[in-house]
Amino acid sequence: MPTINQLIRKGREPQKAKSKVPAMEKNPQKRGVCTRVYTTTPKKPNSALRKVAKVRLTNSREVISYIPGEGHNLQEHSVVLIRGGRVRDLPGVRYHVLRGVLDTQGVKDRKQSRSKYGAKRPK
């Protein structure tokens, strides 16, 4: 614990908040190119094959991002837009791919929560 004299000389330094999405560099979304599209398994106690993509961003950072929704058309060299937001049961996955933007198609036959999956209004 510092003495009063030390506090007068130096003062307390406010703690800096560390970003949860450093690769975004304070941007809401960022564009990138898929370098690898694959499936991975979640942590215990969940079980599934989660679709993820390794993306090289325009700031030349490589990140792993989750592809939400049922079915996707992404492959290597697809251009995608990513947003922040981690997937709790996939360690190291801190970003989401935006559906219905650039090379990513929206989810087919989606009736509810369409805006989150880039699906147009059904006729």
UniProtKB/Swiss-Prot annotation:
Region named Disordered: 1-29
Protein's GO biological process: translation
GO-annotated molecular function: rRNA binding; structural constituent of ribosome; tRNA binding
An annotated GO cellular component: small ribosomal subunit
SUPFAM superfamilies membership: Nucleic acid-binding proteins (SSF50249)
Record InterPro entries: NA-bd_OB-fold, Ribosomal_uS12, Ribosomal_uS12_bac
Pfam families hit by this protein: Ribosom_S12_S23
Modified residues (3-methylthioaspartic acid): 89
Signal sequence annotation: none
Claim: Ligase is one of the keywords in the record: no
Key words, A-Z: Methylation, Ribonucleoprotein, Ribosomal protein, RNA-binding, rRNA-binding, tRNA-binding
Known function: With S4 and S5 plays an important role in translational accuracy.
Family annotation (NCBIfam families): rpsL_bact
Subunit and interaction comment: Part of the 30S ribosomal subunit. Contacts proteins S8 and S17. May interact with IF1 in the 30S initiation complex.
HAMAP family referenced in this protein's UniProt entry, alphabetically: Ribosomal_uS12_B (MF_00403_B)
PANTHER family (alphabetical): 30S RIBOSOMAL PROTEIN S12 FAMILY MEMBER
Protein family according to the UniProt entry: Belongs to the universal ribosomal protein uS12 family.
Protein name per UniProt: Small ribosomal subunit protein uS12
Organism: Rhizorhabdus wittichii (strain DSM 6014 / CCUG 31198 / JCM 15750 / NBRC 105917 / EY 4224 / RW1)
